[in-house]
Amino acid sequence: MNRLLTFGSHKNADEGVCLLEACSVRAGEPFSDRPDSVCFVLSSFLRKVNDLAFFDDESRTRVLSPLIDSLVSSSASDDVQKARAYLLTNSTLLEMLPLALRTYSMSNTAEVFEALPPLTPENIETVSGQYKAALAQIKHGVSVDEVPPHLGGLLTLVYRAAKGAIKALSQMNGSLWKYQAEEVALCAAHAYSWVSDDDEGDPDVVRGLTEGTYSLMVSLVNRAVAIR
């Protein structure tokens, strides 16, 4: 399907096509933004990214359309999808959050996160406390006078997304794990959409941050699909 990817869900392709709807068409499924062929966790993440992370349809299409072929074969077992939820959380904490912190000239705090081990099912009860302590440094360490005016509120967005992802991941157990996995995916999507609404700053700065975020997001999806 060679057409622009658009915002939101649609009744049919004549109205428009988002990333997940394009996947349903590519897979030969009924037209839907919840195709069976796509991993539940990645589908939850990318539905929100499709709608929040882009300034225009051209950017959305350029970044997301190359992912379609790999996504339509990403449906997997519960264990694999849980592993992907862990990856989304770790990417938010160890990639997106440090990027946001360095934007605010908080490199020392970024290094604190980068020195922490990735969260796993085996260590989450102990290591999540270390992440929460590091998040507290952000909450109390941001000086309004030091924040570039055009980035106001963006670090707060990533901070809240990271905090929410940890909370949801720590509760991802039992028969209702998908509810928490979906919350992880939504939090990660918000973190990866942190600069999409900023149109007040230096265009070159905003463009650089946005393209850097897109590159990380594409890498994240490719790594997630590779988990089998």
Label the model's feature ranges.
Residues M1-R228:
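Short, glycine-biased loop/turn motifs at secondary-structure junctions and
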